[in-house]
Regions:
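Transmembrane alpha-helical segments that form the membrane-embedded catalytic/substrate-channel core
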Residues: 17-27, 84-93, 116-123, 147-158
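Juxtamembrane helix-entry segments on the extracytoplasmic side of multipass membrane proteins
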Residues: 71-73, 134-144
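Conserved small/polar residues in nucleotide/adenosyl-binding loops
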Residues: 159-164
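Small-residue-rich segments of transmembrane alpha-helices in multi-pass membrane proteins
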Residues: 106-116
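Membrane-interface helix termini and inter-helical loops of multi-pass transporters
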Residues: 126-135
Length: 169
């Protein structure tokens, strides 16, 4: 068993355990937040803390492997970083969050999740996969790319709309 497969197995077991645990305990986040989960930080800074590892770690993977990677892997990593730059920095700055906080335990557990998630994806993209240039013309690529840009378009609409109701009038 390779290291990557071992990490995948362990992470799958962690995911299954958390899935089962959350049937019995509601995660203290957002509208379900409760006191008693420890020290709290600003929701805006908590969001940046928990999402930014995805951007930075993929950037490190890209820098370390740029010269010996396929064009497809580089393109996929860049799309990933565009998404996580928006998710890590743009959204928290633009979000209508005032005087809200989150438990540090939630931010740190999401930080850990994002760190392991990017380790798995970056290892796949830059060390295991063997994507040929022909992947750029495949149906799954066009479907995924279309979905990516449709989601980006919807986010842009939501960012520029004063109210979500304005989109449906």
């Amino acid at each position: 068993m390779t290291t990557h497969q071992l990490v995948m197995l362990i992470w799958s077991l962690v995911g299954l355990s958390v899935f089962i645990y959350l049937f019995f305990q509601t995660a203290p986040y957002g509208r379900h937040q409760e006191k008693g989960w420890g020290f709290e930080i600003s929701s805006r800074w908590g969001w940046i803390l928990m999402e930014s590892p995805a951007f930075y770690l993929m950037l490190i993977f890209l820098i370390l492997n740029f010269s010996n990677s396929s064009h497809f892997s580089i393109f996929a990593a860049i799309l990933f970083m565009i998404h996580y730059f928006n998710r890590s920095f743009i959204w928290p700055i633009r979000a209508r969050i005032k005087n809200k906080s989150m438990p540090v335990t939630i931010a740190l557990s999401a930080f850990l999740f994002n760190f392991v998630n990017v380790y798995i994806q970056g290892t796949w993209l830059f060390y295991i996969s063997d994507y040929a240039t022909s992947h750029f013309s495949s149906v799954p690529f066009f479907l995924g790319l279309s979905l990516f840009f449709i989601g980006m378009f919807i986010n842009c609409l939501l960012y520029t709309s004063p109210s979500p109701r304005d989109l449906w009038i």
